[in-house]
Amino acid sequence: MNNTIFDDVFRTMIEKMPYLAVPLINEVFHTSYPEDVKITQLRNEHQQKDGEIITDSCLLIGKKMYHIECQSTDDTTMAIRMIEYDFAIAVENAEKQGRRYRIEFPRSCVLFLRSSGNTPDYLEADVIFPDGKTHVYSIPAIKMADYTKDHIFEKNLLMLLPFYIMRYEKKKHDMRKNLELLQILLDEYDEIRINLEKELTETGKAELYTNLTKLIVKIADYIFEKEEDIRKGIGDVMGGKVLELESERLKAEGEARLGDLINRLIQDQRMEEIQMASTDPEKREQLYKEYGI
């Protein structure tokens, strides 16, 4: 199974909606950052002699670095990989004080989209230093399976919503034959849509609602690639409002564009063309091109 879609969706949220990571950081590391805290995105590519290491996210809040990896499977080598990633991040951001360096490791965690009873709550490795001292390197493991939709909304963990569909992944074959199971899924996603709409559109975040809903549908389409009825059902439940919001956005952009054109015509004393610009689409497009609008 090609798992790059999960990385793509996760990185899209980190890069374009980094503030969604703040509640997750608060949840995992018991911090209390406000939603509008300043976030600096650090480099995800870390050059080493034997090749390049690419991490999913590295964020700076205040003076603290946070590293979150999104993992679609329960990889038993993840603890070693995290040490490697974190060491690369720490070295790249090392501070030099005279001839002495200060290397601070990031606060890290792994988001497991799929997990099992064997997936630990912490990924751990014993690191033995040359002086014989042992330090336990411990990374919190976040498991999607532990979060219901109610928990997600209560804790504002909206970043987890695109991956919520993973809990239904093993039931998809049963849903082909059992319409009741399918209806349970669709009802749950209708609740998600309503809660998300209330959470975001009423607070002036319609664009975030649209973008997040698109990512929810994108993951669902991938998980249910061969189940057309399920794909269509989720698309109908989640996608309808997105199209409506997109329509409203385009309408607003169109009105703003026309208003700009009319102002330009007034400035140029081309009064006779204002009516034509408002009623004749071809003339309007011609004037848009003329003014470069």
Regions found by a protein language model. Name each.
Residues M1-M159, P281-E285, I293:
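Accessory alpha/beta interaction modules
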Residues F29, A90, A94, I165-K170, ...:
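Hydrophobic/aromatic-lined pockets within catalytic cores
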Residues L60-S72, K172-I293:
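Short, charged alpha-helical interaction segments and adjacent helix-coil junctions
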Residues F153-L181:
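Coupling/switch segment of ABC-type P-loop NTPase heads
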